């Protein structure tokens, strides 16, 4: 469960390393975001000499959370960190690689480009 002021790791090579959630895209007063939700975030830590800079406001999709994800068949998936992938306004990832495991629920949410870049889909 991601809420405003939550820090997230970046799971791609876009140039950002750490994000802080500002807002959850969707309903006007949504409290928490889960895997597959789009958030507005600010870059708190960035790699030098990359297109993304610190304090830049961007959009990102959440790909991993510490809070469990329950599936319809009864399985539960839990990750070790909270992570997101930086996206543009159309929903395409800004980076060319995605690091770490990605849940298959992102495919149903039309983030197929992120799923195709991922090394492992759970």
From Swiss-Prot:
- Annotated Gene3D superfamilies: Ribosomal protein L14
What Gene Ontology molecular function terms does this protein carry? mRNA binding; rRNA binding; structural constituent of ribosome
Main location per the UniProt record: plastid
GO cellular-component terms in the record? chloroplast; chloroplast stroma; chloroplast thylakoid; large ribosomal subunit
Alphabetical UniProt keywords: Chloroplast, Plastid, Ribonucleoprotein, Ribosomal protein, RNA-binding, rRNA-binding
Q: Which GO terms describe its biological process?
A: translation
Classify the source by domain of life: Eukaryota
Pfam families under this entry? Ribosomal_L14 (PF00238)
Q: Which InterPro entries match?
A: Ribosomal_uL14, Ribosomal_uL14_bac-type, Ribosomal_uL14_CS, Ribosomal_uL14_sf
What protein does this entry describe?
Large ribosomal subunit protein uL14c
Taxonomic source organism: Arabidopsis thaliana
Coding gene? rpl14
